[in-house]
Amino acid sequence: MIQKETNLVVADNSGAKKVRCIHVFGGTGRRYAGLGDQVIVSVKAAVPGGVVKKKDVCKAVVVRCAKEQRRKDGSYIRFDENAVVLLNAQGEPRGTRIFGPVARELRDRKYMKIVSLAPEVL
């Protein structure tokens, strides 16, 4: 579960390394974001020469979440870290590579570009 002020790892090669959630999409009172949900993040650490710089504000989608999430078949999925992939204005990933596994819930949410770039879908 991701909420405001949650520190996240970036799972793509857009140039950002660490980001912080500053808003969760989905209505006024929505507090938490899970796998496949969109958030607005602020870049806290970035590599020199990357597409994004420190202090940039951009949209992102949650691809790994440390809090277990229940699936329709009754199983649970959880990861070791909270990770996001940065998105452009059209909702496509800003980077050209995805690092680490991503959740199957992204396929249900129509993030097919992220699913195809990911090395593993769990």
From Swiss-Prot:
Molecular function per GO: large ribosomal subunit rRNA binding; structural constituent of ribosome
SMART domains assigned to the protein according to its UniProt record, in alphabetical order: Ribosomal_L14
GO biological process: translation
UniProt keyword annotations, A-Z: Ribonucleoprotein, Ribosomal protein, RNA-binding, rRNA-binding
Keyword Transferase part of the UniProt annotation: no
Gene3D superfamilies, alphabetized: Ribosomal protein L14 (2.40.150.20)
Pfam family, one: Ribosomal_L14
InterPro entries from the UniProt entry: Ribosomal_uL14, Ribosomal_uL14_bac-type, Ribosomal_uL14_CS, Ribosomal_uL14_sf
Keyword DNA-binding included in the entry's annotation: no
GO terms under cellular component: cytosolic large ribosomal subunit
CDD domains given in the database record: Ribosomal_uL14 (cd00337)
Function: Binds to 23S rRNA. Forms part of two intersubunit bridges in the 70S ribosome.
Subunit text: Part of the 50S ribosomal subunit. Forms a cluster with proteins L3 and L19. In the 70S ribosome, L14 and L19 interact and together make contacts with the 16S rRNA in bridges B5 and B8.
Family as reported in the entry's similarity comment: Belongs to the universal ribosomal protein uL14 family.
Alphabetical list of NCBIfam families matching this protein: rplN_bact
Name the record gives this protein: Large ribosomal subunit protein uL14
Native source species: Chlorobium limicola (strain DSM 245 / NBRC 103803 / 6330)
